[in-house]
Amino acid sequence: MFFFNIIDIIFLGDKLMKKLIRFLIIILLIVVYIYRTEIISFSVTTVTDNIKVDPPSSNNYKKDYTFAFASNTDNFHPKNKQDIINILYTTLNSGEDDFSFYCTRDYSTCLDDIKDISQNQDLLSTINNMVSPYNSYKKLYITTSTYGKANIKIDKLYTDDEIVMINNKIEEIKSKIINTNMSTEDMLKAYHDYLINNTVYDEAAAEEIKINNSQNKKNNSHKAIGPLFEGMALCSGYSDAMKIFIDELNIPNYKISTQSHVWNVLYLNGKWLHIDLTWDDPVTSNHSNVLLHNYFLIDANTLLSLDMTSHNFNKSYYPELN
């Protein structure tokens, strides 16, 4: 009798243990279900924190320039907003058209910051203006996943055929107007004068943009093709062509823009100086071709003393110009 009681107790204990285990499993499953997002997020971000990201591949138009607003980076796990800006700049500057990077677990606002940056067209335009026109975007797509992966896709402004065509034209122009005895300032002036003497401002395209807030997609006045091949340009066409010339001289430079205008700025002899071809090629009532040098290699104070409307740039984007 005593023997059977022991067996019964053991059997009962075994049943209770099985029930307890089942109960604990159910509780565990409930907890996992309730916190499934957090658990998955923790697991995935732990993995993404350790994913090795190689730098974007570089083409011939990448520049090793470092600016106050953005610089090249080899850190593709951002820890703050500036890191994201540097990743965007590095990707564009490299000439890459598809690149991914990853948020880290300890950067809790990373995805929100990427979204904010992707919706800030002024900021994106500023980064775009700092790279070679050949690497600049026509359209930029930035997407994110819930678990920290960000992807950049770039639809470039210039096609490969257009780049070859422009480069051939640049070499042709250089052979005619540049010689080895010229100083850097002389070469800059030669490029400035050539573009103005062979280009007129495209008033029709400017009026179309003013009315429709867009321009004919077949019109090339907003690109270097306009002034170099068609003799017509908007401010973006002048500045793209001039930037390509300045890049040939390996001078740190970028385009600078406001809501209504864009021009060039470069670092020469220890100073940041502005060049505005559009305003040195004024539209006249009799359509005569006028060449000015009012906006050639001038500092920011002189620039703003000449015009405070179209040239009133956002100083927070260009700290070196203050």
Model features per residue range: what roles?
Residues 158-227:
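Secondary-structure boundary elements
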Residues 28-37:
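Hydrophobic alpha-helical membrane-insertion segments, chiefly the h-region
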Residues 39-153:
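Intrinsically disordered, low-complexity N-terminal segments that are enriched in acidic
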Residues 91, 286-322:
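Alpha-helical and coiled-coil interaction segments, frequently adjacent to or embedded
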Residues 11-29:
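N-terminal Sec-pathway targeting helices
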Residues 3-4, 12:
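Short hydrophobic targeting helices and cationic amphipathic motifs
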Residues 201-255, 263, 279:
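Flexible, surface-exposed loop/gating regions in the mature catalytic domains
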Residues 236-303:
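Hydrophobic/aromatic-rich core segments of domains that either
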